[in-house]
Design a protein with these regions (language model features):
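Short, low-complexity disordered leader/linker segments with a strong preference
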Residues: 1-31, 335-345
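Soluble non-cytosolic domains of exported or imported proteins
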Residues: 70-73, 88, 139-147, 176, ...
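Pocket-lining segment of extracytoplasmic ligand-binding domains
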Residues: 92-93, 163-166, 174-270
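Mature, folded catalytic cores of secreted/periplasmic enzymes
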Residues: 66, 79, 131, 136, ...
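Conserved C-terminal helix/tail region of periplasmic/extracytoplasmic solute-binding proteins
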Residues: 305-345
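Secondary-structure end/capping motifs
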Residues: 234-315
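Short, solvent-exposed loop/beta-turn-alpha elements that line the ligand-binding surface or hinge
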Residues: 55-62, 214-219, 287-295
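Short, glycine-/small- and polar/acidic-enriched structural segments
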Residues: 24-174, 188-194, 205
């Protein structure tokens, strides 16, 4: 009898846990918990938050609650834990999240094509071969730029020390640490998203060795996308559609008001705990970026193939392109009289 009662109690606990997990995933239609980074590559989010564009599109019945992260892994863990409902995030973490849970959806593109390999002034790097025996910084293992860097090294006959090669990868706690690492000669190069290449160059600490856009067809590759949990999408489709509209309207504002948007994004970075950018590198970085609701799906698939070949993920999910749920986006674009984004298949 006691064993039977214990078994029933265990089932009850498991059932309660499952219900709790499901409730977390479903979230609430009265609050949307949105992840964002104090990075310039998240400018549509920064502008949308500061100008109240996203909140306006969500409506009076849904409160926007912002969660700030400094890395894709932090945001990914929050998504997996059900602590947030949606986040702005790069393609590397997106693929990893989808591989782990399958319970996320990319509902819109955000930013394309803004990363470069910068070499430190005086490091003596004039060809890829010169990186042998050198230290190269990037935002962290499995990050979008980490995948790009290691793939490029392989294409040039180089390997990291973890792979038995002689290029040491130095993961950064924060991308802004690259300034200190360059000035202190702690690293010889860095593969980073904007604005950090522009900052390093503006301060005379480095020179641009490679613009990642040159490695992609037509120079288009995803840097940031808008991702939601499928649990939240299923439970609150109207809220998600309003969020997508907020993202589209934020990008439209940036396109119509580029100078004002540049300053708004810079100010919001500080509000969210980041550092303000000086005028010259800010302007240079801003000019490098393309803000688009097109998620550049082909680049996500290639990123996943690259990550798999590097052993960063076990394999490319056969259904990876199903991560794109663009019906809401295309309905919004149709209402605005704008061309639809092709749905990956």
């Amino acid at each position: 009898m006691r064993k039977a009662l214990a078994a029933l109690a265990l089932v009850a606990v498991i059932g309660t846990g499952c219900a709790s997990s499901a409730a977390k995933a479903a979230g609430s239609n009265t609050v949307l918990r949105l992840g964002v980074f104090p990075n310039l590559t998240h400018a549509p989010a920064l502008v949308g938050i500061s100008k109240g564009i996203i909140q306006k599109d969500l409506g009076a019945n849904t409160k926007l609650k912002i969660f700030t992260f400094t890395s894709g892994s932090e945001a990914s863990n929050a998504m997996l834990a059900g602590s947030i409902d949606a986040t702005y995030i790069g393609p590397g973490p997106t693929t990893s999240l989808f591989s782990k849970s399958g319970k996320i959806a990319v509902v819109s593109g955000v930013t394309q094509g803004v990363a470069s390999l910068v070499v430190r002034t005086g490091a003596g790097i004039i060809s890829p071969a010169d990186l042998a025996g050198k230290k190269v910084a990037d935002p962290g293992v499995g990050n979008t730029q980490d995948v790009a860097l290691k793939t490029w090294l392989h294409s040039n006959g180089l390997k990291t020390t973890d792979e038995g090669g002689n290029v040491t990868i130095v993961p950064l706690t924060k991308n802004s640490d690259s300034i200190q690492y360059f000035s202190g000669k702690q690293v010889d190069a860095a593969w980073l998203p904007e604005p950090y290449p522009s900052l390093l160059i503006a301060q005379g600490l480095g020179t641009k060795f490679l613009d990642e856009r040159t490695l992609w067809p037509s120079g288009h590759f995803a840097t940031t996308g808008l991702v939601v949990s499928t649990g939240y999408l299923t439970a609150h489709p109207d809220v998600v559609k309003n969020l997508v509209k907020g993202n589209v309207d934020s990008i439209r504002y940036i396109r119509s008001n580029p100078t004002q948007a540049e300053q708004i994004a810079n100010t919001e970075i500080v509000t969210l705990g980041g550092k303000s950018l000086d005028a010259a590198p800010l302007a240079q970085a801003w000019a490098e970026m393309t803000f688009s609701w097109d998620p550049a799906a082909a680049s996500l698939q290639q990123d996943a193939k690259n990550a798999a070949s590097l052993g960063l993920i076990d394999s490319v999910p056969s259904n990876l392109l199903s991560v794109y749920k663009l019906d809401d986006l295309n309905a919004i674009l149709k209402d605005l009289g704008l061309p639809a984004v092709p749905v990956p298949a």
